[in-house]
Amino acid sequence: METNFIDLRNLTELTVREFMSNHNVAGHDVDHFIAVRNHAIKALKYENISNSKKLQVEFAAMLHDVDDPKIFSQSIDYQNAKYILDTIFTKMSFENIISDCTYDVFKQGIVTLISLVSCSKNGDDGVEESWMAIPRDADRLEAIGKIGIQRCTDYANHIKLPYYLDSTPRAKTSEEALSFANRDRFDRYKNGHKSVSMIDHYYDKLLHIGRPEYLCSNNPYILEKSNKRNQEMIDYVINFKFE
């Protein structure tokens, strides 16, 4: 079984790389997909769930952005994720890996997990079972901390978003930073409000998504990583050099 999992993982990575070869966007490339998947794999070591559910989590983590409208504006109903899964399982026998559900049920379960990832759509929505939030929380780990700071900067440069405006909060302490990142701002973001600057994006979204109350997986690996990465972002906005 372990050999099959490794072969499947390698085939998945190859298939995704081929699919995304002409579609990489700053912060949303295959390296990001793999980083999110690797967080999910580490988190799954703490979960007592079936192999089929573990595979669904891993696939959802790897495929969570392949239908992102920032990359594929015409994608409908997770068509790219479904296509990649179908491609993979024409090359490898599903029945040799999973025996407790049909392929259609397995695939739909992955789509459901992917649908939970988007912050603007499903920000802090609850899940039926905590493990179902692992792909979302694993993705959030890559949006916060030092890697998240770099990704945010790269994406701001990519879409030509200003670093700050006159109206952007200027926190001097951790307490001020957290007070500016209030629930109203996060609710507006989840309801479609777009951040007006890069630093505003920290207060609208990034300083929220790594807090324990928004990490529905309640997974020990994810909670430990998020705690450190949250502080790195707070330090960043406090020490940001406004001209």
UniProtKB/Swiss-Prot annotation:
PANTHER family: HD_PDEASE DOMAIN-CONTAINING PROTEIN, SUPERFAMILY HYDROLASE, PUTATIVE (AFU_ORTHOLOGUE AFUA_1G03035)-RELATED
Gene3D superfamilies per record: 1.20.58.1910, HD-domain/PDEase-like
InterPro entries: HD/PDEase_dom
The organism's taxonomic lineage, starting at the top: Viruses, Varidnaviria, Bamfordvirae, Nucleocytoviricota, Megaviricetes
Protein name per UniProt: Uncharacterized protein L803
Top-level taxon of origin: Viruses
